[in-house]
Amino acid sequence: MEKNTNTNHTSDDNNDKNHTNEEQEKIILNPNFEDGLNNWTGRACKIVLHESMDSGKIVPLSGKVFAAATQRKDTWNGIQQEISGRFRRKRVYEVTAVVRIFGNNVTSATVQATLWVLNANKREQYIVIANVQATDKNWVELKGKFVIHGSPSRVILYLEGPPPRADILLNSLVVQHAKRNRPSPPPFYENPGFGVNIVENSEVLDGGTKPWFTLGNCKLSVGQGAPRTLPPMARDTLGPHKPLGGNYIVVTNRTQTWMGPAQMITDKIKLFLTYQISAWVKLGVGVSGSSMSPQNVNIALSVDNQWVNGGQVEVTVGDTWHEIAGSFRLEKQPQNVMVYVQGPGAGIDLMIAALQIFPVDRRERVRCLKRQVDEVRKRDIVLKFSGLNDDESFDLFPYIVKVKQTYNSFPVGTCINRTDIDNEDFVDFFTKNFNWAVFGNELKWYATEAERGKVNYQDADDMLDLCIGNNINVRGHCIFWEVESTVQPWVRQLNKTDLMNAVQKRLTDLLTRYKGKFKHYDVNNEMLHGSFYQDRLGKGVRALMFNIAHKLDPSPLLFVNDYHVEDGDDPRSSPEKYIKLVLDLEAQGATVGGIGIQGHIDSPVGAIVCSALDMLSVLGRPIWFTELDVSSSNEYVRGEDLEVMLWEAFAHPSVEGIMLWGFWELSMSRENANLVEGEGEVNEAGKRFLEVKQEWLSHAYGIINDESEFTFRGYHGTYAVEICTPAGIVLKTFVVEKGDTPLVISIDLSSL
């Protein structure tokens, strides 16, 4: 089936220009308490009206009065208003509240705006709108958006968050239609200087260290004997480069982890350009005879005193130079930008060579990848015809062949949530543009069994039915999650025996219920970042999870899944450590069927991503990007980020699928990551996504040659061919699978 790529999704429900006068739309009644506390109630607490509090120190920011939610006994207690019947489904609303806290010696706390939604089937839902850090000193503004996809029976908006016995003060709360702002134009880069290092004296060739300076009381000097070639990832981006001089910066007398060399680069940074960072680093034993255990080295930026990660690597003290790589992008004009190197423990000498920071020409990288894609994702196809007329009419009326690919079989999927599928516009875009799906939370253990013994798979069942009904394959995410903060409280409280029994029951319930329905499972999510089950049940429990899952349902591929594997940002999840994890699991008998790279990435650089893919390829397992999302305030830059990742994955022979972690505004975990606005308009990033998908469809046009053949090279997938003959038009379809040899398709025209 051909995937429709329409970029407008509107209906009578969201065509407000014809149906609603926005000035008459009142979602919140009595928003400024001019009518006392009418329409407002306490959520399991008392609410009172004040002109002032604390001996006149607290007065309204606007108006004459404010409300206080008091005598709160739990964090979810607060002030609320029911808005049932006053909002419109599929319409994006903006909430603006002026809040403050008071009492119980709490000087600062999070205040959160939440929607409680009761659906027609009695299913409860909590939607976090926004939160803000409130204080007892000043009023602050809480601002956020929400959209309701379905037609619930009740909806209540309330404030919550601070510790018990601390009052929530509310001066005003307004809800209005959130109009979409016109997107910013694509950035214009005048003389971007692609590939030009903005770090001064990075090779310290003259033996001096200016303009470098130290953070702290450490000392800088110059050493000799560093590698004379650029690190591999920089070399991959920059191409041929003159040999380096071999000098390097030596940092000694370090008494704190943050001590190291620094340099100001404020005036050299251009907004919205993506910069690659690269260097050689090495550690030496300092005067204190420091620890020989692995140490973290971090190249960082201080952007107006805010830390920005520029890459991290784990290094052992010794004679070996290690590559460190990363990337960054700034989208707001800073006052000061400083690059610095930090990380190893006190007393350890730090050595840095050939630090490079340069803007990357990502479009040129994509052009190169397209040539690589032709080798990896396409196949030669020969349409061999029989039954052609042998008379002279063939020369007078050649047979014209039109080939159109209707479907690319490469998996491109997305995350969906249960509430999303109540919106028919969401479902329309989803089913037309994706061939795989994964559930955001609905299959996770904390969702299916929040309370011990109360198992509910209804949401997952609803979503699975939608996918199966539209021939969309589904990944199972996830059976377990190894990070302790994601484990529901009742599981955390179990003793060792009960926990093992609960683990085995979870496996049996899930894998038996859905046997044969999920194509993949993420067995134990994020094992490089957590160890809840391993710490309590022993190292062998991880392999046991894989083994039991495989026995219960042998059909799905069983995946490991983790984040920051592909970007150089986190030494805990480097490709080398991921490889070791997989090999350890397999040594214990686990059947690891696939490697999941989540792909929550900032300012992606192709050479860094490709390096990780190359390393992981040695495992010989299919690699999937399982949770890909990118973020930029500029929709064009966001689209470029996504394009970089799509082509990088598509061009690598070991990558067998890409899953986006959502696409619809307010249904994603990251801000400025959506491809479709909350009311259905495809934004510039979404348009770029659809354009790339169109590029992944092959078309051919020509005539049958003297050998009764028509040849072309095309992507794997489904095709329709139209043959125009003197006797009429013939229509055929065929499928191109992966293969190293030309695919011959025989077509008989003798019946004409």
From Swiss-Prot:
Gene3D superfamilies: Galactose-binding domain-like (2.60.120.260), Glycosidases (3.20.20.80). The keyword Repeat applies. The keyword Repeat applies. It catalyses: Endohydrolysis of (1->4)-beta-D-xylosidic linkages in xylans. Pathway: Glycan degradation; xylan degradation. Keywords: Carbohydrate metabolism, Glycosidase, Hydrolase, Polysaccharide degradation, Repeat, Xylan degradation. InterPro entries: CenC_carb-bd, Galactose-bd-like_sf, GH10, GH10_dom, Glycoside_hydrolase_SF. Its EC number is 3.2.1.8. Binds to and hydrolyzes insoluble and soluble xylan substrates. Belongs to the glycosyl hydrolase 10 (cellulase F) family. The GH10 domain binds to xylan. This is Endo-1,4-beta-xylanase 3.
